[in-house]
């Protein structure tokens, strides 16, 4: 519900973020040199569609402009403005940190396939 409320239509009686804040939240922040993308993050959110060599890589979300965050043990959520799509995953067992996004990636791909959405990563 948190990420669904970020959509342009909001959820229930309100919109959590206005369009300008969503636009700002999807702009990658670069290193001190202004050119090196080291983390694939913006405003504390992990960004989708990042290159494989960034900290988050494309594994978080395959769509440019998608943003969200994972949590301890493999829980994650994201919103993709391009497709007005929110996805959340809550697991009932802790996953070791090296594998935290493994299930998430499978879930996101399955949802993309089911909805006929392209996986538009570089």
Report the location of each language-model feature.
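Catalytic loop of the DD-peptidase/beta-lactamase superfamily, centered on the K-T-G motif
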Residues: 1-122
């Amino acid at each position: 519900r948190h990420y669904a409320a970020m959509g342009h239509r909001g959820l229930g009686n309100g919109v959590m973020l206005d369009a300008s804040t969503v636009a700002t939240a999807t702009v990658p922040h670069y290193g001190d040199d202004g050119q090196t993308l080291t983390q694939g993050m913006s405003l504390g959110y992990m960004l989708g569609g990042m290159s494989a060599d960034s900290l988050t890589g494309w594994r978080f979300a395959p769509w440019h402009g998608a943003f969200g965050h994972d949590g301890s043990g493999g829980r994650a959520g994201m919103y993709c403005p391009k497709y007005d799509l929110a996805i959340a995953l809550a697991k009932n067992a802790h996953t070791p940190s090296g594998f935290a996004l493994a299930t998430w990636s499978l879930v996101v791909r399955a949802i993309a396939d089911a909805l006929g959405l392209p996986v538009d990563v570089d």
